[in-house]
From Swiss-Prot:
Summary of the function given for this chain in its UniProt record: Functions as a docking protein to recruit essential components of the viral replication machinery to viral DNA origins. In the presence of the major DNA-binding protein, opens dsDNA leading to a conformational change in the origin that facilitates DNA unwinding and subsequent replication.
SMART domains: DEXDc
Chief place where the protein resides: host cell
Region Disordered, annotated ranges: 1-28
Compartment(s): Host nucleus
Annotated protein name in UniProt: Replication origin-binding protein
InterPro entries in the record: Helicase_ATP-bd (IPR014001), P-loop_NTPase (IPR027417), Replication_origin-bd (IPR003450)
Gene Ontology biological-process entries: DNA replication
UniProtKB keywords: ATP-binding, DNA replication, DNA-binding, Host nucleus, Nucleotide-binding
Gene3D superfamilies: P-loop containing nucleotide triphosphate hydrolases
PROSITE patterns documented for this protein: HELICASE_ATP_BIND_1
Keyword field contains ATP-binding: yes
Top-level lineage group: Viruses
UniProt source species: Equine herpesvirus 1 (strain Ab4p)
Length: 887
């Protein structure tokens, strides 16, 4: 573990002395009194509020590990039932003493849905009793419908069987609906349901934050109303937490709420042993696929084909790591299932496994789905998060499970990973082997881990300095989340605003591989699984955990280049005729692109737009260009909203991973005012830098001081907006300026020891980089030119040399000729020696209709049409302008 040095004595609050831990202690004190808005905003505070500011217990609290203690201390009027050693049992529905609302927290495989079916069978004892079941996903709705049918629960319809958009009348009095279609249920029905069921309730609420949630305001209002008024409510989840119970107790009264906490887990989970692996083993992968690394003439490692038999190739590699262990089990004739958090890796694993068996089933977004009943017919099952809640394979067919998890800013989050790992209920050898790829974690120093592993803490193994620093970081994160979504745009959203902290936590912690591991560790243990780290003896120590993170980081970065080379080339199956005669493509070209873009460039763009991240950034660049062309958008929130919704709504054509042309719906962010706030500053940046994607990016070089000054006016606001818009939690400069904080956070990031404080300039450059990269896809690159500007030294004109000399206050009055000025400039070249940066535009943005050009006009017409319905009063009034609204 990187040494943090001796832990000094912490001075009393009144002391003027300094210490390595003074900064984190001051930060803790600074953030201690900042809350998420109190109970009025729905954050469940226990009697000991430190759960939100404890780096050890935060994950456990957010996933309901402290629910029993919290109910006893904070909501004593809520009835509490503790169950263990047996599957979930519901109170009889017809018992007069039964409460109106029942919340069930129980692990996967504890019989929650089975108990629900039994309860509904008794509760629906009369044909006039109605019920609404709200699920988180379409696939889960189908699974529930099948189970309801198998249980012979009569009269249930599903929303996808409705022939009309609005579901109304007797056929839908018993209905299963996915939350995103809740607005399609007729109000008369919604006001009269007798029973509301939310299976996987936390995932259902989490769906409110999905970019596919088109009717957020209406769905939020309807679900809130149902939770407050429906006569009987059943809410179940393995991670049901205090926030949920607190909301229901506030809405219905404590005496109406009954909480069941069941700790039983089926043997398929409770006897499962999980191991976090240190290495991926790309040497085994490379050998199996028939490649070998050789040195080229420059000494660089390159991959070449190895034509030897596979047995000869594999004899030369060490069968360790993820692929080595997978190979051993396949060679031994065992059946394995493999979870991959990315589609591309699932395809690589399929190619690897095909060297040992032909009996392989791959379930991802590129391939057709397959009924769970057929899983038992293959030796190897490979799946992604397309297989999630609702699907269960209960047969003891697979011997072992492997999991590849790559935390990335766009997900999947660790709860989704955990849910996918639970789809195979029985493993013959009860073996789960997990490799967490850290190459997708954020490398910028302004992103820091904030969680400590609870197992190390259980053994008393974390130094006090680690706890103080990470607790302060948790306080900072809590304070950062508090003001989010408090604008007129989000007014009226009850559940969306109330559960925001958990959403931010799950997204922001994806920046850190250590945080992601600690969350997954917590979730697996909550399901009664035993988890260990390869190479770490019991008890797990702080040094052992940090060494593991360092090994993991080094292995992942070494493997990343090889994985990229081994990835199969993609192709475009759609023909040019099919693409360019498509109506959605025609509308897209007119709406977003400048005239005359070549067909091959458009095809390349559609391939890039298959990425959800690129789609978001593409829209953001389009909006930025519109704000530069239409300054009124920066003066009026109504005009900006019109511009933003024009570009962020509708459909975008993409070329999928399979090469097919598809149309993807896009939905504007609900928090338009926060985006307006951000764009006002970013438009100023773009104007000052002469940033134009069609010309490759910025027209000027930037020094560290220039970037610092550019951000200074809105520095803190940028950090807050990045949480709301990009789901990035930037650690503030005042914390990273402390050597102790730097020492702890580098150790928890698996990086070499560094107690060197981050300077103001370094923090500003990193913040600027993240802002433009995450929101607009731009890259901040160091300039290699001797002098600022885009002109080579030998091509500098006289006036350009004068401008350079004056920029560093060099007197040039004695120099009259170009030769003299040039000589003076070269004599003072050291004044330009500091690092300078260029802001490069992403390649996919270069054909966007960005700035007003002589031949532009196509993208202006649809934008003008979109803004035509704005009231005259929405447009800013300038001096001398006529106020048409007043005429």
């Amino acid at each position: 573990m990187p040494s943090i040095g001796p832990i000094p004595t912490i001075p009393d609050e009144g002391s003027r002395g300094s210490s390595a831990t003074a900064a984190p202690r001051r930060a803790m004190a600074s953030y201690r009194d900042t809350t998420l808005g109190g109970r009025a905003e729905g954050v469940a505070f226990s009697a000991v509020e430190d759960s939100y500011t404890s780096s050890v217990s935060l994950a456990r609290m957010l996933y309901g590990g402290d629910l029993e203690e919290w109910v006893r201390h904070t909501r004593p009027g809520v009835s509490l039932e503790i169950q263990s050693r047996a599957p979930v049992r519901f109170p009889p529905p017809n018992n007069p003493s039964s409460r109106r609302v029942t919340v069930v927290r129980a692990p996967m495989g504890s019989g929650k849905t089975t108990a629900l079916l039994k309860w509904l069978g008794e509760a629906l004892d009369a044909p006039d009793i109605s019920a609404l079941v709200v699920s988180c996903r379409r696939s889960f709705t189908r699974t529930l419908a099948k189970r309801f049918n198998d249980a012979e629960l009569p009269g249930f319809a599903t929303y996808f069987t409705s022939t009309d958009y609005t579901m109304a009348g007797e056929p839908f009095r018993r209905l299963l609906v996915q939350i995103e279609s809740l607005h399609r249920v007729d109000d008369n029905l919604l006001n009269n349901y007798d029973i509301l069921v939310l299976d996987e309730v936390m995932s259902t609420i989490g769906q409110l934050y999905s970019p596919t949630m088109v009717h957020l305001n209406k769905v939020d209002a309807l679900l809130t109303r149902l939770l407050k008024t429906c006569p009987r409510v059943i809410a179940m989840d393995a991670t049901a937490n205090a926030q949920l119970v607190d909301f229901l107790a506030s809405a219905r009264g404590e005496r109406s709420v009954h909480v069941i906490i069941n700790s039983f887990a089926a043997p398929g989970f409770s006897q499962r042993d999980g191991t976090l692996l240190r290495t991926l083993g790309t040497d085994v992968l490379r050998a199996a696929l028939g490649f070998v690394l050789v040195d080229d003439e420059n000494g660089t490692k390159v991959m070449e084909t190895d034509s030897r038999p596979i047995s000869a190739r594999l004899r030369e590699v060490n069968s360790a790591g993820f692929f080595g262990r997978l190979m051993d089990r396949l060679v031994a004739g065992r059946n394995v299932c493999v979870f991959s958090s990315t589609v591309s890796f699932s395809e690589i694993v399929a190619r690897f496994c095909s060297q040992f068996t032909d009996s392989i089933l791959v379930l991802n977004s590129l391939r057709p789905s397959e009924d769970v009943a057929f899983w038992g017919g293959v030796r190897v099952l490979i799946y992604t998060t397309v297989v999630t809640v609702g699907l269960s394979f209960d047969t003891a067919h697979f011997h072992s499970m492997f999991a590849y998890v790559k935390p990335m800013s766009h997900g999947p989050d660790m709860v989704s990973v955990y849910q996918s790992l639970g789809r195979v209920r029985e493993l013959i050898h009860n073996e789960l082997l997990v490799y967490v790829d850290s190459s997708g974690a954020r490398a910028e120093p302004i992103f820091t881990p904030m969680l400590l592993n609870h197992v190390v803490s259980r053994q008393g193994g974390w130094p006090a300095e680690f706890s103080q620093v990470t607790d302060a970081l948790c306080c900072q994160f809590k304070a950062r989340c508090g003001p989010a979504y408090r604008t007129a745009s989000t007014r009226g959203l009850a559940l969306f605003v109330r559960f925001k902290y958990k959403h931010f936590f799950e997204r922001c912690t994806l920046a850190s591989v250590g945080d992601s591991i600690n969350i997954l560790y917590t979730l697996l243990e909550s399901n009664q699984m035993r988890v260990a780290i390869e190479g770490c003896q019991f008890p797990l120590t702080a040094a052992g955990f940090c060494d593991f993170l360092q090994d993991l980081r080094l292995d992942a970065y070494a493997a990343r280049k090889e994985i990229k080379q081994l990835r199969g080339p993609g192709g475009i199956a759609a023909t040019p005729t099919e693409v360019f005669e498509n109506d959605d493509v025609a509308v897209f070209i007119q709406k977003y692109l400048r005239p005359g873009v070549a067909h091959d460039e458009i095809l390349a763009l559609l391939v890039e737009l298959n990425s959800p991240i690129v789609r978001e950034q593409f829209v953001n660049v389009a909006v930025l260009g519109a704000c530069l062309r239409l300054p009124a958008a920066l003066e009026s929130p109504e005009v900006f909203a019109g511009v933003y919704k024009h570009y962020a709504s509708g459909v975008v054509p993409v070329i999928s991973d399979a090469g097919a042309l598809e149309s993807v719906s896009i939905t504007p962010d609900v928090n338009v005012l926060a985006r307006w706030d951000l764009y006002k500053s970013c438009t100023r940046h773009a104007r000052d830098l002469a940033w134009d994607p069609s010309r490759g990016g910025s027209g000027l070089d930037m020094s560290e001081d220039f970037i610092t000054n550019t951000l200074s006016a809105d520095y803190n606001r940028f950090q807050s907006l990045l949480v709301e818009i990009a789901k990035c939690n930037v650690t503030p400069l005042e914390m990273l300026a402390a050597g102790a904080v730097r020492g702890v956070t580098t150790a928890l990031s698996g990086r070499p020891k560094s107690r060197v404080p981050l300077s103001k300039g370094e923090h500003a450059v990193s913040l600027f980089k993240v802002l433009w990269e995450d929101v607009f896809g731009a890259k901040l690159a160091k300039s290699t030119q001797t002098f600022p500007g885009g002109v080579r030294v030998k091509n500098l004109r006289k006036d350009e040399i004068v401008a350079l000399l004056e920029s560093v206050n060099v007197n040039h009055s004695e120099c009259k000729t170009h030769r003299e000025l040039y000589a003076l400039l070269m004599c003072n070249r050291k004044l330009f020696a500091g690092p300078r940066y260029k802001l490069r535009a992403p390649k996919w943005s270069r054909n966007l209709c960005f700035l007003e050009l002589d031949n532009t006009g196509t993208c202006k017409t649809p934008l003008d049409a979109a803004l035509a319905d704005l009231a005259p009063s929405a447009w800013p009034q300038v001096y001398g302008a006529v106020d048409f609204d007043a005429l």
